[in-house]
A protein has these predicted regions:
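Short, charged/polar, low-complexity loop and linker segments
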Residues: 25-26, 47, 92
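Membrane-embedded alpha-helical bundles of multi-pass integral membrane proteins
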Residues: 1-25, 30
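Short, flexible loop segments at boundaries between secondary-structure elements
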Residues: 271-275
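Active-site proximal loops enriched in glycine and acidic residues that flank catalytic Cys/His/Asp
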Residues: 46, 54-56, 70, 112, ...
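Juxtamembrane segments of multi-pass membrane proteins
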Residues: 27, 50-70
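Short cysteine-rich clusters marking metal-coordination/redox-active sites
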Residues: 42, 52, 98
Length: 275
């Protein structure tokens, strides 16, 4: 009852995003009862901060202080006000520094969903104010324009397949496996070795498989930094492309692709796949 039953780390989808007038959380009154219960549940043990990789590296993020600052405002009776959270209560730098790794949530004895709180405030910064950490805007532009975060030539995505005798999926043909390679395995030479090894395994298995020529970035990065609009556009494009083909299982090459395809795509119409 006190915790979400959805997968840990799942970012809530904004329904009918083009019709919304506000995005994320920018004022205290926008927090719901569960968010406020989380603030009150903090026992101030500091385990979240102790395991935060950004904090341990000397960065500006202190998960404990974020929750305590929000709790303090709540106890002072600010729940009905229109007080702006950033920078009055929480600094922009701390929100933008979060990697959304979830270590704080795993360690919290009260199971406070710290990352979700940060994500909601960061979504407001991204979609309402256009504020991102340094370098993020360029990465988002790359995903939108060429389908990968590094701005590399989309025509070179499958160059590493040369000589491997791997088929591109065709409509009307059934495949046991559709191999979702992902951007890292497609462009990074070290990760290409892993993808090639997986192809050898698939060939030895005797299963029919193919890759999808239209594959592009799953845009998980966009969602994590708060750019939900780009994420939804990219996701719907990927789902539409996947639905052209007949396959039993979708095999993801990396944990980021796996989590996105398995846990987040099902939020969208026709986004349910056996991953």
């Amino acid at each position: 009852y006190w915790q979400r039953t959805k997968p840990r780390g799942l970012v809530e989808k904004i329904d009918n995003i083009e019709e919304q007038e506000s995005f994320g959380i920018s004022r205290f009154g926008q927090f719901n009862w569960h968010d406020r219960l989380n603030f009150d549940a903090c026992v101030e043990c500091g385990r979240c901060t102790a395991v935060c990789p950004v904090n341990r590296a000397g960065g500006p993020l202190d998960p404990r202080e974020i929750i305590l600052s929000l709790k303090k405002r709540m106890m002072e009776g600010y729940t009905k006000t229109e007080e702006v959270l950033v920078p009055d209560v929480v600094s922009k730098e701390s929100l933008l520094a979060c990697t959304t790794c979830g270590a704080c949530v795993e360690q919290c004895p009260s199971r406070i969903e710290i990352v979700n709180t940060i994500q909601q405030m960061r979504r407001s910064l991204a979609l309402e104010e256009g504020q991102f950490a340094e370098g993020v805007a360029k990465t988002l532009q790359n995903i939108q324009s060429v389908g990968n975060p590094w701005g590399l030539d989309p025509d070179a995505r499958w160059a590493w397949l040369e000589g491997l005798d791997v088929a591109f999926a065709e409509p009307g043909v059934h495949y046991d496996i559709l191999y979702w390679v992902g951007c890292s395995a497609a462009y990074d030479k070290r990760n290409q070795k892993i993808a090639k090894a997986m192809i050898k395994i698939l060939k030895h298995s005797g299963l029919s498989f193919a890759v999808m020529q239209e594959e592009m970035c799953n845009a998980e990065f966009a969602r994590r930094v708060g750019e939900e609009y780009l994420y939804q556009i990219q996701t719907q494009t990927n789902i539409d492309n996947l639905r052209q083909y007949n396959f039993t299982r979708l095999l993801a090459a990396c944990p980021h692709c796996f989590n996105t395809l398995k846990n987040e795509y099902p939020e969208f119409e026709r986004g349910q796949f056996n991953v």
